[in-house]
């Protein structure tokens, strides 16, 4: 996963009023959490944060903070992100301070590869699980995990346990959970049950 530098400013004051003023100035209130540290309140540039978590991999990009104090040079990943429902811009973000030598747990998007044989035969694709929980070192966080569905027939499914985990990663999600299924054509059951004319 790529690393990006993000400038941050420490903030001593908290509260709704302060957060509103920060947002009006184009900044996003944030809190940094981590093992062995007390939560630290900071603010980030809205544009810079949006660009840092845009594209493939999104929230799983490793961010390096550039700021005053002990957090300068700290590596973080997004733990929780609140967006404005109308403008779709970040309103608040929780960051998790990580050690690049320690494994982390993150959610990674699944990418379906190929057109299922069952869809070509008239079936419908039911994509039930769009991401899985993965454990790995930060540098091994994948942008996505491919799931080959080209050979999937009507009535067949792919479960989490069938997904090939990228090198250096372990998938933690329930192996029995259904990821994608191919359902029969609408009305197919009725056609099969109907007597021949």
UniProtKB/Swiss-Prot annotation:
Instruction: Name the SUPFAM superfamilies for this protein.
Output: Ribosomal protein L25-like (SSF50715)
One GO MF term on file is: structural constituent of ribosome
- CDD domains this protein is in? Ribosomal_L25_TL5_CTC
**Paired cysteines (S-S):** none
Q: Which cellular component terms (GO) are annotated to the entry?
A: cytosolic large ribosomal subunit
Pfam hit, one: Ribosomal_L25p
The alphabetical list of record keywords is: Ribonucleoprotein, Ribosomal protein, RNA-binding, rRNA-binding
Gene Ontology biological process terms in this record: translation
Ribonucleoprotein as a keyword of this entry, yes or no, is: yes
User: What is the protein's known function?
Assistant: This is one of the proteins that binds to the 5S RNA in the ribosome where it forms part of the central protuberance.
Q: How does this polypeptide assemble, per the annotation?
A: Part of the 50S ribosomal subunit; part of the 5S rRNA/L5/L18/L25 subcomplex. Contacts the 5S rRNA. Binds to the 5S rRNA independently of L5 and L18.
Family per similarity comment: Belongs to the bacterial ribosomal protein bL25 family. CTC subfamily.
Protein name, UniProt field: Large ribosomal subunit protein bL25
Lineage of this protein's species?
A: Bacteria, Pseudomonadati, Thermodesulfobacteriota, Desulfuromonadia, Geobacterales
Instruction: Point out the gene that encodes the protein.
Output: rplY
């Amino acid at each position: 996963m790529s690393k990006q530098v993000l400038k941050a400013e420490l903030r001593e004051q908290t509260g709704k009023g302060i957060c509103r003023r920060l947002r009006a100035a184009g900044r996003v209130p944030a809190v940094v959490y981590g093992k062995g540290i007390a939560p630290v309140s900071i603010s980030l540039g809205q544009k810079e944060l949006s660009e840092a978590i845009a594209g493939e991999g999104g929230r799983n990009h490793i961010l390096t903070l550039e700021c005053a104090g002990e957090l300068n040079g700290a590596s973080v990943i997004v733990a929780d992100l609140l967006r404005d429902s109308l403008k779709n811009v970040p309103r608040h973000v929780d960051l998790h301070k990580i050690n690049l030598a320690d494994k982390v747990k993150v959610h990674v998007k699944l990418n379906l590869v190929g057109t299922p044989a069952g869809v070509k035969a008239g079936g419908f694709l039911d994509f039930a699980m769009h991401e899985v929980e993965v454990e790995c070192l930060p540098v091994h966080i994948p942008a996505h995990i491919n799931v080959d569905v080209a050979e999937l027939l009507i009535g067949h499914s792919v479960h989490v346990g069938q997904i090939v985990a990228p090198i250096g990663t372990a998938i933690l999600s329930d192996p029995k959970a259904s990821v994608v299924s191919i359902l029969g054509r609408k009305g197919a059951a009725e056609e099969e049950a109907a007597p021949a004319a």
